[in-house]
Amino acid sequence: MKNPIIFGCQGLVLTAHERSFFKEFPPLGFILFKRNCSTKKQVISLINSLRDIVGEKVPILIDQEGGRVQRLSPPIWNAYPPPEVFGLIFNSDKEKARQLIKTNYQIIASELFDLGINVNCAPVIDLSEKRGHSVIGDRALGSDPKTVGVLGKAVIEGLESGGVSGMIKHIPGHGRAEVDSHESLPRIDSCLDDLLSREFSPFIQLRFAAAAMTGHLLFPKLDPTHPVTFSRKIINDIIRNLIKFEGILLSDDLSMNALSGSIDDRYINALEAGCDVGLHCNGNFQEMELVAKACPGIKNVAKSRIRVFLKKVADVSENREISDINELNVKLRKGLKGFFNFM
């Protein structure tokens, strides 16, 4: 089994150093960012290079949520509405919103599938909170847990019908965080009962998802010392036993400023706490080498979840529904008229 880490890479093509490193230390998968995406031909070539080294079925991840978070952006690729648009439609017409968001992510999946990308790090099922930091903002599907659960499920259905697996984030809920976890560690002082009725609810509704990504968040009333990604107590007691999430658990990006310690210590701490796979996004070669040297053995339970995840990704790709994308685009544009302006 490959090493339990997802790596980013530095640019539009692999360097000789990257090729050598990934061959010597094959990661479970890769994640792409804007710095890696210029044209369709270039992205396909980069992905083929990665798969030539690591294996043709290796997961290739991307954050293609719509709105502010689109690693594949116009004019080469389509513009997509921020997720909150579908929550607004849901307030007046639940079924219309559900169908439109499914269609939206079918179209996104089609673009990703054609490039060779097989995992989209979406949906965001954090709640929109008035006091929450704008890092979530319009990425959220709404403020009502049931709404977010229904629409999040439709996102996964849309992606899978297009041959791409989804990933729920940021478990167990980033919405109340008043600071950006890219910059510092958010502290959420809510009690368990309050969190269970709101933040945790969408994750409980989507506990069947194949994959989830942690939030780098401190919940002092659940674990006063460790952020979620490093908290054995929260991962075991809350994510696994209370939320009952059984899929593969990825850390959020280990290089984010919410976390402290060296990058290799962060990686070890995340896996020891119960994350199945670490995520390292920035392409910093020195950091990746430190992670590789620190890589521990994979626990049997993590091996089992990783195997299930890899099979799920392969099955979703193989069972893709063939749809008329032009017809879906017409349907989406018509349904979103007055809510989102396609440029």
Mark where each language-model region is:
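Active-site mouth loops of central-metabolism enzymes
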Residues: 3-16, 83-103, 182-197, 255-261
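N-terminal hydrophobic targeting/anchoring segments and the immediately downstream early-domain regions
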Residues: 1-60, 64-77, 343
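Extended, intrinsically disordered, low-complexity segments
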Residues: 297-343
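Glycine-rich, aromatic-flanked loop segments that form ligand/cofactor-binding clefts
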Residues: 53-81, 104-128, 148, 156-172
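Short, acidic/polar
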Residues: 10-24, 100-111, 197-202, 262-269
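A substrate-binding/cap region within the structured catalytic cores of diverse enzymes
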Residues: 88-117, 124-140
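Second-shell residues forming the walls of enzyme active-site clefts
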Residues: 7, 35-53, 58, 150-160, ...
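Glycine-rich anion/phosphate-binding loops
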Residues: 38-45, 90-110, 143-151, 193-196
